[in-house]
């Protein structure tokens, strides 16, 4: 036996038989015999194979032709693969629906994951430190707004969604009543904190899981990894809806007074919407979910609206809140206020080796 293709065990007689049976086209011979169809894509055997076929057909190799060589044997330049990934396209920035307003109003930016978020809004005579202090005082004494659209928003839905979340969070989410919220910690397989956020139960089989800004894609992937690899027969579906909603935090002792100036169908009173509950309806003619949650320690509401209505709501809030001293505040003011309240921040109080007990969160 005379071997031509050592990977697919094609012999000289196989090629000669192909020619005898009428496979004169080199592409037909290739598929009839599997000559050159292994991982080398013919680079190790096709030249000799073409010579054998040409002899069997009584014609020169040029007349027989060659087959098409395919990757991965034929190398590609990196420029072919990544030519567009340069300059601004190297790492595209993610912007919230309210980004343009922040830019027009003097926001000083900081990177948070792939997002750009306002660090502060310095005025003409202020440095960033002075701006942060002013924003904090404005929220503590009156009312402020924070663009929280970057926070992760993952829908978990299905008959097994409750027990699935019980496996991922340190506390029980299956017992959370519809209409209420619960703070959740998520740990990795070693018990170290990896993310946190407020979980809201939307219906009997649907939960909305808020994640950190930088953790949305990672946590969604974490969920899918467990679903697809370990609990593949559970009836659960997840969807990352982070960019489909704009979310605005309205915080401060005058937060309720501000929101009540806008027409809407949601009762914002403390009795109708107590802490850690949410309600759905409309505000200023915009469909919305309003969560009575706080990351500042002050009276606070987070309002989620369709992304294309986020700027509209933000501008309406600032329009009706001028006499209340409404002030936009950035991430640094948020950091200071949450630290004063004693709330943790993933990445600040955690470093990949922190467990809940280290932070006094064994209750969560």
Regions inferred by a protein language model and the residue ranges of each:
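Glycine/proline-enriched, intrinsically flexible loops and inter-domain linkers
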Residues: 7-9, 21, 32, 48, ...
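Noncatalytic alpha-helical scaffolds and linker/capping helices
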Residues: 1-27, 35-47, 60, 87
């Amino acid at each position: 036996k005379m071997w031509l293709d050592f990977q697919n065990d094609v012999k000289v007689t196989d090629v000669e038989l192909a020619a005898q049976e009428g496979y004169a086209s080199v592409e037909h011979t290739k598929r009839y015999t599997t000559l050159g169809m292994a991982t080398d894509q013919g680079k190790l055997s096709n030249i000799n194979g073409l010579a054998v076929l040409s002899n069997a057909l009584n014609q020169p190799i040029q007349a027989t032709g060659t087959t098409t060589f395919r990757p991965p044997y034929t190398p590609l330049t990196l420029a072919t693969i990544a030519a567009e990934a340069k300059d601004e396209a190297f790492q595209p920035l993610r912007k919230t629906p309210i980004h343009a307003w922040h830019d027009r109003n003097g926001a000083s930016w900081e990177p948070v994951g792939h997002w750009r978020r306002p660090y502060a809004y310095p005025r003409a005579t202020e440095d960033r430190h002075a701006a942060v202090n002013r924003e904090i005082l404005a929220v503590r004494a009156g009312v402020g707004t924070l663009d929280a659209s970057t926070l992760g928003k993952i829908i978990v839905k299905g008959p097994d969604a409750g027990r699935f979340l019980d496996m991922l969070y340190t506390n029980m989410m299956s017992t959370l009543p519809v209409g209420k919220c619960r703070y959740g910690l998520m740990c990795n397989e070693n018990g170290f904190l990896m993310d946190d956020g407020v979980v809201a139960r939307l219906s009997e089989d649907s939960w909305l899981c808020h994640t950190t800004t930088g953790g949305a894609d990672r946590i969604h992937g974490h969920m899918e990894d467990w679903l697809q690899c370990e609990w593949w027969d559970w009836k659960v579906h997840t969807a990352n809806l982070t960019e489909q909603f704009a979310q605005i935090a309205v915080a401060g002792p005058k937060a309720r007074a501000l929101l009540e100036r806008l027409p809407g169908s949601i009762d914002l009173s403390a009795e109708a919407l107590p802490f850690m509950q949410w309600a759905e309806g409309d505000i200023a003619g915009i469909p919305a979910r309003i969560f009575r949650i706080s990351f500042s320690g002050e009276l606070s509401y987070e309002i989620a609206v369709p992304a294309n209505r986020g700027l509209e709501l933000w501008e309406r809030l600032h329009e009706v809140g001028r006499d209340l001293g409404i002030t936009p505040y950035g991430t640094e003011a948020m950091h200071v206020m949450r630290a004063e309240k004693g709330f943790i921040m993933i990445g600040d109080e955690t470093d990949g080796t922190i467990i809940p007990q280290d932070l006094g969160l064994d209750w969560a």
